[in-house]
Amino acid sequence: MSTPMVPYSPTPKPVSSVWRPDLTRLPVLTRSRRLVRRLFQILCRGIVLVCTKTTLHGLENYPRRGPALVVINHLGDPDAILALAVLPDFPEVIGKIELRDIPALRLVADLYGVIWIHRGQPDRRAISAALEAFRQGRRIIIAPEGRESVSGALESGTDGAAFLSLKAGVPVVPVTITGSEFRRIENNLKKLRRSPVTLKVGKPFILPPSARGQDGLREATRIIMETLARQLPPAYRGVYAYVDK
């Protein structure tokens, strides 16, 4: 079967309507911030335990030291809580700048420390912050789809994740989540049921260093997204449903 080079999403990817680059910076890992992140992880684990029946596969694949780019599919609002609850460290989070307009999220993000990004725009400050994080040996988590899926399955990837991995020469760690749709979890909670959720950590891989130019970047993005698709059940593969066929 022929493989499409650039799968398309059902609707155009969002572009940030605001431009506040002064807010984009790499969080400083002070002692107090490390403590806040630890407390936040404990809180996330409590929420996950109460609201879901989470099954975790492949945690041994997660790198314990050294820089890495963690890529996840994005089904719903609970994804960040689930990922931060199960991962053994406190990765840097790349988040859309619009989240700062929600007071509660702004408070949490400022305490944890988030690298803000302006989607659909050449955000050099976000790139610089991410590359500095890698130089310091930190791990970064990002959703390469660029938004929460509007179809309930994998959408086409944007090139940001591939660019960062290639630029920094760091491994990509694929993490997939199923069952985290907000509506599904909300409906089960109303019935006093915990929602079954599955997370899978795949083996880290290095993108081809020969990838150059826009075509090479798109190819690297395709590799990332197809790797995520192969970790997902067929119903969640979306525009990458052709993999393994």
Language-model features and meaning:
Residues 30-52, 106, 110-113:
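Short hydrophobic helices that act as membrane-entry/anchoring signals
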Residues 51-53, 90, 111, 137, ...:
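A generic structural signal for alpha->beta connector loops
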Residues 43-74:
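Helix-to-loop junction immediately C-terminal to a conserved catalytic motif
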Residues 2-36, 125-245:
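Non-catalytic C-terminal accessory region of glycerolipid acyltransferases
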Residues 35, 39, 43, 79-82, ...:
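Hydrophobic alpha-helical segments typical of transmembrane helices
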Residues 56, 93, 114-116, 172, ...:
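Conserved beta-strand scaffold positions in the cores of enzyme catalytic domains, especially
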Residues 52, 120-123, 154:
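A conditional alpha-helix N-cap/helix-loop micro-motif detector
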Residues 62-122, 129:
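Catalytic core of membrane glycerolipid acyltransferases/transacylases, capturing the structured
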